């Protein structure tokens, strides 16, 4: 049996088109093209624009990888792609490209759960030890997992309303700041100015819920504007970030203690947040934190997770 794998991976779940090439677990090429600058003109992601962007760029990125690596595409053994979750039109572009390519080059098709790939995004350049607690915080999801193996991933807590990243984007937009909101709010964060209390903290065991926080912050801004009361946007943004990150940390501590775990892996776009990373690193556990380039949507995490599944004769769990 051939144990040498050449894996092309594809990510197209939202507004990033990304392709990567792995020789076994070694990343040898990685391309990301984002439509965020286009989306920012509309204040957020427009699904139709995002899927059209994927269609325009996916072949170009594939050709860039071929030119850069000089590989013969017929030597690719596996084509991994994000199967779910994501924007339907965007996922469709990646899926069609992956399927057509796999047929043309006679490669094995590997559908991947995007969220579980985020869980393992830190494994691109380090080994993870099972069992561990997994945290995925992004524009679409806020989830905590118990991870016993590559295909044994149990949801412990997840949001049933707005994801944390979505709240960042919407609050930034109401403040008049550009999309995406996460990096801008984080850049402007000042702990000594985080003085506002919008809502009360929730019990640690309760599912993630950021809708009430988002609504309270936006109402505060709207009320101030309507009454012509001046306010400092940095105070509002800092207060929001401090509360939101503290809620995440509180839940992490709860589940680490509940399951007697001392390993923690984080992923997703919000895992790039400097306050979250700082607080994670201060916990008395072994933490796996992805490099900044691997925090957002990217094909490297898809390929790394695909390799682990292939190598260990496992399949991605195609449910959240």
From Swiss-Prot:
- Please list the coiled coil stretches: none
Q: Name one Pfam family in it.
A: TsaD
Which is a GO BP term held by this UniProt record?
A: tRNA threonylcarbamoyladenosine modification
Class of enzymatic activity (EC top level): transferase
Where do the annotations place Fe cation binding?
114, 118, 297
Q: Quote the InterPro entries the UniProt record gives.
A: ATPase_NBD, Gcp-like_dom, KAE1/TsaD, TsaD
The cofactor remark states: Binds 1 Fe(2+) ion per subunit.
- KW Glycoprotein (keyword) present: no
Q: Which SUPFAM superfamilies match?
A: Actin-like ATPase domain
Q: E.C. number, please?
A: 2.3.1.234
The UniProt annotation places substrate binding at 136-140, 169, 182, 186, 273
Q: Which cofactor does it need?
A: Fe(2+)
Q: Where in the cell is it found?
A: Cytoplasm
Query: Which keywords annotate this record?
Result: Acyltransferase, Cytoplasm, Iron, Metal-binding, Transferase, tRNA processing
Known catalysed reaction(s)? Answer: L-threonylcarbamoyladenylate + adenosine(37) in tRNA = N(6)-L-threonylcarbamoyladenosine(37) in tRNA + AMP + H(+)
The record's GO CC annotations read: cytoplasm
State one molecular function term (GO): N(6)-L-threonylcarbamoyladenine synthase activity
Which Cys pairs does UniProt list as disulfide-bonded?
none
Q: Would I find Acyltransferase among this entry's keywords?
A: yes
Question: Into which family does the record put it?
Answer: Belongs to the KAE1 / TsaD family.
| HAMAP family the UniProt entry points to | TsaD (MF_01445)
Q: What does this protein do?
A: Required for the formation of a threonylcarbamoyl group on adenosine at position 37 (t(6)A37) in tRNAs that read codons beginning with adenine. Is involved in the transfer of the threonylcarbamoyl moiety of threonylcarbamoyl-AMP (TC-AMP) to the N6 group of A37, together with TsaE and TsaB. TsaD likely plays a direct catalytic role in this reaction.
Entry protein name = tRNA N6-adenosine threonylcarbamoyltransferase
Please report the organism this UniProt entry assigns to the protein.
Ureaplasma parvum serovar 3 (strain ATCC 700970)
Q: What is the lineage of its organism?
A: Bacteria, Bacillati, Mycoplasmatota, Mycoplasmoidales, Mycoplasmoidaceae
């Amino acid at each position: 049996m051939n144990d040498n794998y050449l894996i092309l991976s594809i990510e197209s779940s939202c507004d990033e088109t990304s392709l990567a090439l792995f020789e076994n677990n070694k990343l040898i090429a990685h391309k990301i093209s984002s439509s965020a600058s286009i989306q920012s003109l509309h204040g957020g992601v427009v699904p139709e624009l995002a899927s059209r962007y994927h269609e325009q760029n996916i072949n170009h990125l594939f050709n860039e990888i071929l030119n850069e690596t000089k590989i013969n595409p017929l030597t690719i053994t596996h084509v991994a792609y994000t199967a779910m979750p994501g924007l339907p039109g965007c996922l469709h572009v990646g899926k069609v490209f992956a399927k057509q390519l796999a047929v043309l080059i006679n490669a094995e098709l590997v559908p991947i759960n995007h969220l579980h790939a985020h869980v393992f995004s830190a494994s691109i350049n380090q080994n993870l030890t099972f069992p561990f607690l997994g945290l995925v915080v992004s524009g679409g999801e806020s989830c905590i997992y118990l991870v016993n193996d590559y295909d044994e991933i149990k949801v412990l807590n997840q949001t049933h309303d707005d994801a944390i990243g979505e709240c960042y984007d919407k609050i930034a937009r109401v403040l008049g700041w550009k999309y995406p909101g996460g990096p801008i709010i984080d850049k402007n964060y000042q702990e000594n100015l985080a003085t506002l209390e919008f809502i009360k903290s929730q019990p640690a065991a309760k599912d993630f819920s950021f809708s009430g926080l988002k609504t309270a912050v936006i109402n505060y801004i709207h009320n101030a504007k309507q009454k012509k009361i001046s306010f400092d946007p940095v105070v509002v943004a800092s207060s929001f970030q401090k509360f939101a990150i503290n809620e995440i940390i509180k839940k992490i501590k709860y589940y680490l203690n509940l399951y007697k775990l001392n390993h923690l892996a984080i992923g997703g776009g919000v895992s790039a947040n400097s306050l979250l990373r700082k607080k994670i690193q201060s916990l008395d556990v072994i933490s796996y934190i992805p490099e900044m380039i691997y925090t957002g949507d990217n094909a490297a995490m898809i390929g790394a997770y695909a390799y682990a599944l292939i190598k260990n004769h496992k399949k991605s769990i195609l449910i959240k």
